[in-house]
């Protein structure tokens, strides 16, 4: 056969396109920007009444939050050219709602990195955070862009002597501030220690183990989860063509095994198409696995 083609396939079979990428930075310095108080809807980041402009990324980005907010973010970037802006939902959850992809695209365009100097208006690796974390489905979309989503836990409920929340006159829990993230605060994300630090005092603020799981770090390293998905597909295909075993390159998959429980129809489809079957164990919902794709379905389109 063709020697050059075999060299390429051999490289693909050990996923050199991924393993040769540089690791993510050890420390990421950020400057905070409070996008709003309470839960932040994706409609604030990508308004539904401007949906007609979503195909034009440059135009659609102009409707994120407000012109005033965009000017303030750009001013922060001018004052802190070596730092990334962290968009925050103070006392709430970031990214509730359904316009998640266009929403995170707008955040990335304003605060992320350029994918390429030759591709205009496509950025990646935004950093978003919320006092109560990130909405689960929005967090998945953050991973699509190779971004970072942080549960700040910078406010907590004030408790009485019995450990029960103290309520105000409106019946809502009284909150106590654990640390401040007011606009302009300088923080350091240490990706190796998986900690968040106050840059000014050096004080450790929170643990970030949930933010930097092995799988999420891979998404950040590759520039997004799609790159990992397609990379695994390339590796599997190359190994199949060369008729060699699949070499471990990526982080271990999460496996959920419930020996006494039956399988749903969807679980049966996935199990019958597993590429790397181990000990004939059946995997259940919540597992990560490589599968052969031979069916396409759609949820709502």
Question: What kind of feature is each model-predicted range?
Answer:
Residues 1-301:
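Fe-S-dependent hydro-lyases/dehydratases of central metabolism
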């Amino acid at each position: 056969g063709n020697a050059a083609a075999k060299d390429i396939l051999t490289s693909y079979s050990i996923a050199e396109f991924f393993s040769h990428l540089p690791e993510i930075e050890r420390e990421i310095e950020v400057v905070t920007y409070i996008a709003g108080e309470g839960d932040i809807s994706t409609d604030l980041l990508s308004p539904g009444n401007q949906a007609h402009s979503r195909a034009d990324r440059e135009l659609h980005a102009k409707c994120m939050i407000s012109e005033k907010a965009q000017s303030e973010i750009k001013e922060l970037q001018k004052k802190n050219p070596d730092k990334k802006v962290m968009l925050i939902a103070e006392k709430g959850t970031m990214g509730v709602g359904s316009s998640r992809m266009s929403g995170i695209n707008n955040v990335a365009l304003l605060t992320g990195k350029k994918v390429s100097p030759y591709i205009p208006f496509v950025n990646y690796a935004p950093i978003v955070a919320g006092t109560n974390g990130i909405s689960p489905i929005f967090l998945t979309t953050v991973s699509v862009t190779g971004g970072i989503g942080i549960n700040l836990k910078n406010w907590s409920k004030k408790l009485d002597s019995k450990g029960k929340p103290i309520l105000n006159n409106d019946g809502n829990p009284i909150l106590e501030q654990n640390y401040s993230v007011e606009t302009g605060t300088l923080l350091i994300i240490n990706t190796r220690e998986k900690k968040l630090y106050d840059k000014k005092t050096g004080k450790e603020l929170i643990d970030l183990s949930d933010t930097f799981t092995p799988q999420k770090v891979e998404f950040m390293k590759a520039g997004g989860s799609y790159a990992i998905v397609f990379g695994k597909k390339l590796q599997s295909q190359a190994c199949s063509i060369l008729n060699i075993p699949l070499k471990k390159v990526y982080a271990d998959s999460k496996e959920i095994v419930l020996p006494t429980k039956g399988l749903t129809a969807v679980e049966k489809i996935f199990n019958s198409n597993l590429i790397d079957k181990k000990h004939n164990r059946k995997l259940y919902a919540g597992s990560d696995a490589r599968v052969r794709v031979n069916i396409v379905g759609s949820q709502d389109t």
